[in-house]
């Protein structure tokens, strides 16, 4: 699949802010520049102009500004040397005069392939012997190129292989037989490749989130295989264990896969493109995993019927002791878990959101280091763009110029605006005598390739670019709001740019977090009611599904960790995966109740039958997610960390909270219709429990 980590793809697709930005791009071109920092060089050094000229000749660069090129354009319009130096300081020349910058504007072909353009720029710098500490390189295209490099298949392959090794070892520990383990892992690899093929056919693109798709598909497939094998082990005493196991397994497995599908599909409510695609791709992975694992794992058991062995009696007795302790003290267990979840849940009110393109990169990245150094010593790459629309006004050029200058002064008054740039920046503050009416002279002085940067549609649209500080990403939103306030009485002014889009993305992410979680919760609850045909049991069973999410997100709220793209997706996905174990236990509980057992005995039997595979499946899934911590992308790391934490918490909720809640369900004792097919040792422990209840 082709890689696409363009920053704009992470911004809301449909919004008023996005529409305004698209209009800005149509009139002035994309707001994308590559900033080259040259330490310890003076503007008059021949090397500076040589580099600028070579960069201008690249097909991906439409023009490269150097300090001398900025200055010469101003000199042509009679700007004084003192004023030129003042205007270039903080834009192309550092305040301490120990660094200067080249501003390379991307051409349409450069926008098509940013990575190739950045490589061409690096070749020019290398040819000019500007390497290491002798040059700094940053800008949106540089960040995108680095994201594409890190998102390459070769980088994802590392933690995928690591995950494959870990999960293979864990599967062998659970199964205890190499042939069956190898067969399951081959099915898993097939499911991953089939998922990638379907996503590719659907037109999907690779980005750093999609790097987690292979691990997600692996986890789905292995979880289903673990449950199929467990059902088979529990049916070994029956005449046809495979047929019996499939008869009992298909419903909870299919419903679990459906819940996972719902959790992932709920992400498709997002207006952020990569999140939408990840939701679709993950949902495809859930379906493919169901077909492969439920369809092919029985074939392995048919091929090697003796590969799956029953649990040892010592291990079974340990499980029964634990189950007995849980269901015999349901009130204490429920109260303890409830208090812990409630205390952590208070942290939900402290959740906040944040999106910063630099957070996508490793903290030690040279791209991040260069950006921070350039912003500290030279200028920021973040900007808010003001579009001034004179509509059909026939006012003279100079009248418009003075009006733009007044607006620019207002915008520059904000404390977080570090520098402004417009057509007026190339003209003197006071026009020399004889120039006032010479519009033809101004048009000639500002060549079309320069005019297009700040003028459009003749002289209708004028642009003022405001560079803003980025020390605190939260300041972007406040700065945008303040600039809107400063220009509120000027209807001709419209504000746009990447910075306000990022602010809009933060709100979209936070809103999408709650929307995807609530929609998946409601749909899964409805699915519970329809499949179990019991509203009370369904609502009771949803409590342990939401508890791990409340627990983990409450903790990050207490810790003050902001919700980013990676964390935002975990809630609905984890909910769909946590339901996996819940379905198996609820169906086992319901079958036992229908057989005439009490709530406490049914909870005990359900925990004995499903507790071990629930724990194994969650452990395998957690280990798979932990491998994502090896990713170079911070959001992917946070996604893996959050998913692992929630899945591990689901073991605690599934093996303690759920059986305790089930044991508390009221209901009249029914006549025992039949005895469940359970190991004799289980009955030996169950009978005293039933007798104790009767007493």
Provide a role label for each language-model segment.
Residues 1-9, 23, 108-356, 471, ...:
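Membrane-embedded transmembrane helical bundles of large multi-pass transporters/channels
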Residues 16, 33, 330-448:
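Juxtamembrane segments of multi-pass membrane proteins
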Residues 19, 46-109, 116, 146-149, ...:
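Extracytoplasmic
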Residues 30, 96-98, 259, 380-381, ...:
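Short flexible coil/turn linkers enriched for glycine and charged/polar residues
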Residues 34-39, 89-126, 135-136, 384-394, ...:
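A short beta-strand structural signal in non-transmembrane regions
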């Amino acid at each position: 699949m082709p890689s696409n980590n363009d920053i704009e793809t992470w911004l809301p697709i449909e919004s008023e802010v996005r529409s305004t930005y698209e209009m800005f791009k149509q009139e002035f071109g994309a707001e994308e520049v590559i900033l080259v920092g040259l330490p310890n060089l003076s503007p008059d050094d021949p090397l500076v102009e040589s580099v600028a000229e070579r960069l201008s000749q690249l097909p991906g660069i439409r023009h490269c500004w150097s300090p001398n090129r900025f200055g010469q354009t101003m000199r042509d319009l009679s700007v004084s040397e003192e004023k030129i130096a003042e205007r270039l300081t903080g834009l192309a020349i550092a305040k301490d005069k120990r660094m200067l910058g080249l501003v390379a504007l991307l051409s349409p072909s450069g926008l098509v392939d940013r990575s190739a353009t950045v490589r061409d720029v690096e070749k020019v710098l290398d040819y000019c012997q500007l390497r290491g500490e002798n040059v700094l390189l940053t800008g949106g295209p540089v960040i995108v190129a680095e994201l594409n490099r890190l998102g390459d298949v070769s980088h994802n392959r590392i933690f995928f292989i690591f995950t494959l090794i870990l999960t293979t070892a864990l599967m062998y520990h659970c199964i205890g037989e190499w042939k069956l383990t190898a067969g399951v892992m081959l099915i898993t690899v097939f499911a991953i490749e089939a998922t990638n093929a379907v996503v590719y056919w659907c037109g999907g693109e690779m980005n750093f989130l999609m790097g987690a798709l292979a691990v997600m598909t692996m986890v789905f497939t292995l979880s289903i295989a673990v449950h199929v094998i467990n059902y088979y082990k529990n049916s070994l005493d029956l005449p046809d264990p495979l047929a019996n196991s499939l008869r009992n397994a298909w419903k909870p497995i299919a419903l679990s896969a459906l819940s996972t599908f719902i959790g992932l599909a709920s992400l498709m409510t997002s207006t952020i493109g990569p999140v939408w695609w990840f939701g679709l791709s993950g949902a495809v992975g859930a379906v493919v995993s169901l077909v492969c694992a439920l369809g092919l794992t029985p074939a392995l058991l048919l091929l090697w019927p003796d590969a799956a062995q029953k649990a040892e009696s010592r291990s079974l007795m340990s499980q029964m002791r634990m189950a007995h302790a849980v269901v015999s003290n349901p009130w204490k267990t429920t109260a303890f878990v409830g208090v812990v979840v409630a205390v952590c849940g208070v942290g939900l009110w402290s959740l906040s959101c944040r999106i910063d393109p630099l957070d996508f990169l490793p903290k030690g990245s040279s791209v991040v280091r260069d950006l921070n150094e350039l912003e500290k010593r030279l200028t920021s790459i973040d900007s808010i763009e003001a579009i001034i629309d004179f509509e059909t006004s026939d006012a003279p050029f100079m009248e418009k110029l003075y009006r733009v200058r007044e607006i620019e002064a207002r915008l520059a008054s904000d404390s977080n605006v570090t520098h402004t740039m417009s057509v007026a920046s190339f003209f003197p503050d006071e026009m020399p005598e004889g120039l006032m009416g010479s519009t033809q002279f101004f048009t000639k002085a500002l060549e079309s390739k320069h005019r297009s940067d700040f003028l459009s549609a003749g002289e209708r649209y004028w642009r003022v670019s405001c560079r803003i500080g980025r020390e605190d990403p939260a300041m972007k939103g406040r700065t945008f709001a303040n600039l809107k306030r400063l220009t509120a009485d000027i209807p001709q002014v419209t504000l746009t740019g990447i910075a306000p889009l990022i602010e809009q993305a933060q709100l979209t992410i936070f809103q999408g977090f709650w929307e995807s979680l609530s929609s998946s919760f409601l749909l899964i609850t409805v699915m519970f009611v329809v499949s179990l045909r019991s509203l009370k049991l369904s609502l009771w069973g949803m409590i342990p599904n939401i508890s791990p999410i409340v627990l983990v997100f409450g903790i990050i709220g207490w810790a003050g960790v902001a919700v980013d793209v990676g964390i935002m997706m975990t809630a609905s996905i984890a909910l769909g995966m946590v339901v996996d174990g819940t379905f198996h236990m609820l169906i086992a509980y319901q079958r036992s109740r229908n057989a005439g057992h009490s709530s406490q005995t049914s909870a005990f039997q359900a925990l004995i039958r499903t507790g071990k595979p629930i724990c194994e499946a969650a452990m395998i899934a957690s280990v798979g997610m932990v491998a994502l911590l090896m990713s170079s992308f911070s959001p992917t790391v946070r996604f893996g960390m959050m998913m692992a934490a929630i899945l591990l918490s689901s073991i605690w909720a599934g093996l303690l909270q759920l059986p305790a809640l089930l044991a508390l369900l009221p209901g009249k004792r029914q006549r025992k219709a039949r005895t469940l097919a359970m190991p004799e040792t289980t009955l030996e422990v169950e009978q005293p429990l039933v007798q104790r209840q009767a007493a």
